[in-house]
């Protein structure tokens, strides 16, 4: 699958629709897309998706659906009805769940990209050990990614540290969306496995997710432009 349009996804990690729209108005939909996650969507609902779409932005609805197959299928279909560009599910929900999500989109002429989440970038080996998983983050990512591809997903969310291996294992057309991306001048925050935008793209990331380095910048538009220029 070829990558078209902006590769930068700005994480709109707000709890108020007005704060989201104030920032969106400073950004250029020709340079970036917007990621709307659980906190903002729970607070503002579909209205926030519609509002930023009216400003010209593609939306990645980052709700990481993980439930029984029928419930996830209904949620993915609802997201598609909103006209989102991308939506995601947890690969750990299993093959039947992911296949149900894919099948829910069959009748849509303009389907959103359907992406599976592998291992959250906040998790390292000690976190996995704590929930009874002894394999490395890299091994778990590879296993879940193979299951996601088998289930008909368009790609995965993974650390940029695994993006290159993902392309080798799953093929160049299998999309990689990588959070935990921070310019070298910023702190890592709560993301443990982080790389810079340039490193991420060089390592095989198709789309990079950046939050606070843009949303909390003194000049968000300039911060966004700097990242875009660094990956072109």
UniProtKB/Swiss-Prot annotation:
SUPFAM superfamilies: Ribulose-phoshate binding barrel
BP-aspect Gene Ontology terms: 'de novo' pyrimidine nucleobase biosynthetic process; 'de novo' UMP biosynthetic process
Enzyme Commission identifier(s): 4.1.1.23
Pathway: Pyrimidine metabolism; UMP biosynthesis via de novo pathway; UMP from orotate: step 2/2
A molecular function GO annotation: orotidine-5'-phosphate decarboxylase activity
Reactions the enzyme catalyzes: orotidine 5'-phosphate + H(+) = UMP + CO2
Entry GO terms, CC: cytosol
SMART domains: OMPdecase
Quaternary context: Homodimer.
Function according to Swiss-Prot or TrEMBL: Catalyzes the decarboxylation of orotidine 5'-monophosphate (OMP) to uridine 5'-monophosphate (UMP).
HAMAP family listed in its UniProt record: OMPdecase_type1_B
Family stated for the protein in its record: Belongs to the OMP decarboxylase family. Type 1 subfamily.
Name of this protein: Orotidine 5'-phosphate decarboxylase
């Amino acid at each position: 699958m070829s990558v078209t349009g902006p590769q930068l996804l700005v994480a709109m990690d707000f709890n108020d629709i007005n704060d989201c729209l104030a920032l969106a108005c400073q950004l250029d939909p020709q340079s970036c897309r917007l990621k709307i996650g659980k906190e903002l969507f729970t607070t503002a609902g579909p209205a926030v998706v519609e509002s930023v779409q009216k400003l010209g932005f593609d939306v990645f609805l980052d709700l990481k659906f993980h439930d029984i197959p029928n419930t996830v299928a209904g949620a993915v279909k609802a997201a598609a009805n909103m006209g989102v560009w991308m939506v995601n599910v947890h690969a750990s929900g299993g093959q039947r769940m992911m296949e149900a999500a894919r099948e829910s989109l069959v009748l849509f002429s303009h389907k959103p990209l359907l992406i599976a989440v592998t291992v959250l970038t906040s998790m390292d080996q000690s976190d996995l050990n704590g929930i009874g998983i002894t394999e490395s983050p890299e091994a778990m990512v590879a296993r879940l990614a193979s299951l996601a591809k088998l289930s008909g997903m368009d790609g995965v969310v993974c650390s940029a540290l695994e993006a290159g291996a993902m392309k080798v294992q799953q093929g160049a057309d299998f999309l990689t969306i990588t959070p935990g991306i921070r310019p070298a001048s910023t702190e890592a925050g709560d993301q443990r496995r982080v790389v810079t935008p340039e490193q991420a793209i060089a390592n095989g990331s198709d789309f990079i997710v950046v939050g606070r380095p843009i949303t909390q910048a003194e000049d968000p538009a300039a911060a966004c432009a700097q990242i875009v220029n660094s990956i072109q």
